[in-house]
Each structure stands twice: as C-alpha cells, then as structure tokens.
Amino acid sequence: MTYKPPYEINTSILNKVAAIMKMIGKFSSMNNLSSQPLLIRKNQIKSIHSSLAIENNQLSESQVKDLINGKLVIGPQKDILEVQNAIKVYEHIQDINPYSQKDLLKYHKILMTSLVSDAGSYRKGQVGVFDDEKAIFMAPPTDRVPALMNDLYDYLNHYDENILIKSCVFHYEFEFIHPFSDGNGRMGRLFQTCLLASEEEFFYYLPVESIIKKKQLAYYDAISRSNQEGASTIFIEFMLDAIIETMNDTLKQSNIETGSLSIQAKKLLTVLEEGIPYTTIELMDRVGIKSRASFKKNYLDPLLQSGMIEMTIPKAPNSRNQRYIKK
C-alpha cells in the first residue's frame, strides 16, 4: 500500500488550488515566459538570494548578481561559496529529476561542497533546532532517515495527488525529516520548485523563495504549527498562498516586459539596480537626458504608476531629499 503522510484537504486548500489553476491558464495564454530572458534572469537572482538569505547568508541581491556575472565580490568566504554552489545548481535546474533520491543526493553534494564534510550523503548524527540551549525541534533519529526518505519518495512517485498539494507535502515532510546535516531548507525549497515545474515549466522561473523570505517568520511558524498538529495542512495553506503571491507578481512583471511600458520607461528600468536609492539627476544621467520635464513625463512617471519603482518619501513627492528605488 502506498504511503501517505498525514494531512487534510480542506475547503481553504481547494480554493487556493483552484485560484492557482486559474492563474496557470493566464500563464499559458500569455507570451511564453521562457522567451523573456531578462525576467528569467532577474527571478533566478531573486531565487538564489532569497533562499540563501533565509539561511542567514549576508550577501546582497546585487552581489549575487555580480557573482553570476563572474565579477569579484567582497564578503564572508562562506557566504560567497554558498552563492557560487547555488549558481552551479540553478544552472542545471531543468536537469534535476525531483522524483529521484539519487538526484537529491547529487545536487545536495553540489550545493554543499566545501561547506560540510558529508555533502551528498544523509546525516550520520542527530540534528535539531535550538533557542539558546533549549530544543525547539528535534529531527527523527539518524537510523530512521533512510526509511523515512524511502516512504516520502514512495508517496512522491506513487500516490495520486494534485502536484500543487504534493509538492507542499514533500517540502514539509522533507524539512521534518531533516535528512542532511545542513542545507535542508534550501534543498526543500529547490525540490518543491522542481516538482511544480515537472508539471508546468514556467514554475522554474517563479521566485517563490522571495515571498518565503519576505514572510520568513510565518514560514517557520507554519512549519512549527504543522509539527504540533502532526500534519502538514497548515504548511500546505501557507505555501499555496506564497505560490499565488509569486504568480501575481510575475504576471505583473511579465506584462511590463511584454509591452505595457514605453521604450523610454523600459530603458530606465534596465539601468537601475534593485534596492539602491537614486536622485532624479542620477536617473537622468543614466538614460542620457537633460530635460527634467521630458524625463518625468516619459521615463519616471510611467514606472511610478506601474509600481516598478517607488519614492523613498512618498508623502512629499517634491522633497529635495527624494530618492527613487527599483522594487
């Protein structure tokens, strides 16, 4: 009999699945997301940065971008190595078979090479989550890990379930088992993405990790509450919400990439780095325009209206200290 982890499919989950299925239709009907290389690249940077930032990596999104582009980055060597390893994995993300334990071990080895001594192997010791010296969560005993992972992959490969739900269940159960000595969080998030993409390819290009990072406390709370309930239902609901939010954000971005912005606004957008505040003069210099009125009308205002950039002092638009940040 095929193993099934404990969870319930309630009305909330069904409604969220229905909402995602409706949005999948929108993705299918619009221009192929894979034909938008700038958006794909931007989202890949977000995925790598966010998944590692959740694990306390201190490098910024722009530093991750520089490493992807082969530039020199100054920072903690461990953090740089984590990003470099993640880049190697994400370069081959479409080659990953998420239904294979062999691939799980293979890509864990790439992700954690030179970071842990047992990269690519299940843990040999006990692990847990601690607050000071108090154990908040203790993972199952080491000798149970192989059997628990076999059960999880039995569910993954043989139980008939909607992939949206199944991928969330896998993510939660994987984190509960904590099969590796380190790297469990980033592997769980990566393999959920690969499971989703095995059904709908555009999921490769959705930075769900960025929403998880934004709601990191809620992410851990959903895991903790599911642990207490002994079922992954709460976590499934959280992750489905994260997927919905990511899809909405990506649809918005894709519409901008595919022509709803003027050529001038797109030009300004391409020369800005995310999270860096710019003055009006700096922005005008970047696009090579001298007329402040023309710049405001054709470049700046369309991006402000679309929500692609925002003011640092929105309540005082004309402030001399006003800066603009790409979101």
PLM regions with names:
Residues 1-327:
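FIC/Doc superfamily catalytic core
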